[in-house]
Amino acid sequence: SSAASDVYKRQIYIDIERKLQEGKKVLFVGLPCQVAALKNFSRNQDNLYTVDLICHGSPSPELLKMYLKEKSVDIEELEGLNFREKTSFGLRSVGKNNGFPRIVDMYTYAFLKSIDYTENCYSCRYASQSRVSDISLGDSWGSELSEEEKKKGISLVLCQTKKGEELLKKSNVELFDADITRAVSYTH
């Protein structure tokens, strides 16, 4: 139920706050609204590192439950759910359109057409260049890297804070400078 999921979400913030009070470092990855909620909830942010995922909108959990039920999938039996596969963009069935294979799936189609979001996503105050996290991650659709590099998988990484710089310096990722205007123009 929706009330149960709200309790679960609050419990996550309580658990994180407890770890911060114990002096532990915590890396929280979530949607911008979830990061903002955690920052509003937490009083101990010195050891809190945040990463937000550049969001296209969050589909309704109830719609996902309906979709899985329609596909005869028992949500209690799921060990994981992958929305993104490089080979098929996470879509499940194949049809034909204009002479080339076209992947069709109503759940993903609704997501890509922005018609299945939770209500607050339609007026999201975090859908801007002003970010709430130390680092923002998203698709790098506007990358100027070669097609060969793109096949390896690339992401847009935006660093907003000293904590973000600290995380990136400790990471083992290859970073390239990007034109922020171009990068943002290709995101949703």
Predicted regions and their residues:
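Long, compositionally biased charged/polar accessory segments in the mid-to-C-terminal portions
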Residues: 76-186
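Gly/Ser/Thr-rich loops at beta-strand to alpha-helix junctions
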Residues: 28-38, 57-59
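A short alpha->loop->secondary-structure connector
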Residues: 43-53
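Generic beta-sheet signal
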Residues: 24-30, 48
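Short, small-residue-biased leader/transition segments that mark boundaries at the very start
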Residues: 1-8
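Short glycine-/acidic-enriched loop or helix-start segments at secondary-structure transitions
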Residues: 37-40, 168-169
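A short, well-structured juxtamembrane/interface segment
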Residues: 9-19
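Short, charged, surface-exposed secondary-structure boundary motifs
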Residues: 58-67
